[in-house]
């Protein structure tokens, strides 16, 4: 079976930065940071989580809590003994427009017992957090990045994402078409060919794609192409080369599609992102 996550991580980087390894006692607030979410591991102790939801979240067993996008949240624990945490900032390249960050709900909480596939990397991560070996910080950071891939695998395997790209990648038929789009965005993709990738008729494929992913295949492909174009612009590549790589005939065609998607020309977007010299 084709690797459903390979193109996502190949094109759009994710970086973790560990910032907490130990107890948090009483009330601890985390303000949103532009372009970064957080991945928290609660090893032991009870936690009340306040993050703007109608009801507060109670964690009473070892759990992971992922915020893929910036969101203010507050932990309330026993003021004397607290709860044991290991936490990392998670920076998705492109921020909230990163395909994975955009595809996930505002927060995900999973008991560690519900993600048995993560047991080995969690054991390594917790052991490293308790030790003082040289290279501890980069080791923890890389282990958090590996853990994030495991979490995505588990979310897809358990069907916990109900709509959007990850739901499409979890679908037994649609995932073949999505992987094909991700792997060859420069190609023209007639509806008939995508339907064949999914083993469906044109009508059934189009309706299923829209219901599960939330857009038409054409709109999805354009969004994926523009995301790749933005990555190329962040890397300082020439627009004409980007256009060829993502399936547009030239700079003018890419600029039109870019403006239709973002409301800005590529030059305006680079300036707004602080990428102009």
Model feature map: region roles:
Residues 1-18, 26-30, 106-109, 131:
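A short, N-terminal "cap"/entry segment at the start of jelly-roll beta-barrel domains
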Residues 16-106:
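N-terminal regulatory/effector-sensing and dimerization cores
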Residues 45, 117-128, 176-184, 228, ...:
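Solvent-exposed, amphipathic alpha-helical segments
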Residues 98-123:
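Aromatic/histidine-rich interaction motifs
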Residues 108-116, 129-144, 148-187, 191-198, ...:
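Short, Lys/Arg-enriched, Trp-marked, Pro/Gly-tolerant hinge/linker segments that flank
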Residues 179, 183, 187-193, 200, ...:
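Terminal helix-turn-helix DNA-binding modules in bacterial transcription factors
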């Amino acid at each position: 079976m084709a690797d459903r996550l390979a193109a996502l991580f190949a094109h759009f980087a994710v970086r973790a930065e560990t910032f907490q390894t130990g107890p948090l006692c009483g009330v601890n607030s985390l303000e949103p940071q532009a372009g970064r979410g957080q991945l928290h591991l609660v090893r032991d102790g009870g936690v009340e989580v306040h993050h703007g939801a109608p009801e507060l979240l109670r964690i009473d067993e070892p759990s992971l809590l992922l915020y893929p996008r910036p969101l203010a949240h507050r932990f309330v624990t026993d003021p004397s003994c607290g709860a044991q945490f290991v936490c990392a900032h998670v920076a998705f390249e492109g921020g909230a427009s990163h395909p994975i960050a955009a595809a996930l709900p505002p927060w995900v909480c999973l008991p560690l017992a519900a993600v048995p596939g993560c047991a080995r990397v969690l054991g390594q991560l917790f052991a490293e957090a308790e030790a003082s070996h040289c290279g501890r910080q980069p080791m923890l950071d890389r282990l958090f990045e590996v853990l994030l891939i495991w979490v995505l695998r588990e979310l897809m395997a358990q069907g916990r994402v109900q709509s959007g790209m990850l739901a499409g990648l979890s679908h037994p038929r649609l995932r073949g078409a999505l992987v094909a789009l991700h792997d060859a965005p420069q190609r023209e993709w007639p509806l008939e060919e995508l339907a064949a990738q999914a083993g469906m008729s044109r009508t059934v494929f189009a309706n299923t794609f829209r219901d599960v992913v939330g857009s038409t295949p054409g709109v999805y492909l354009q969004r994926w192409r523009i995301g790749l174009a933005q990555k190329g612009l962040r890397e300082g590549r020439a627009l004409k080369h980007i256009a060829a790589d993502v399936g547009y005939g030239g700079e003018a065609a890419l600029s039109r599609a870019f403006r239709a998607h973002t409301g800005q020309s590529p030059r305006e977007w680079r300036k707004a992102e602080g990428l102009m010299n």
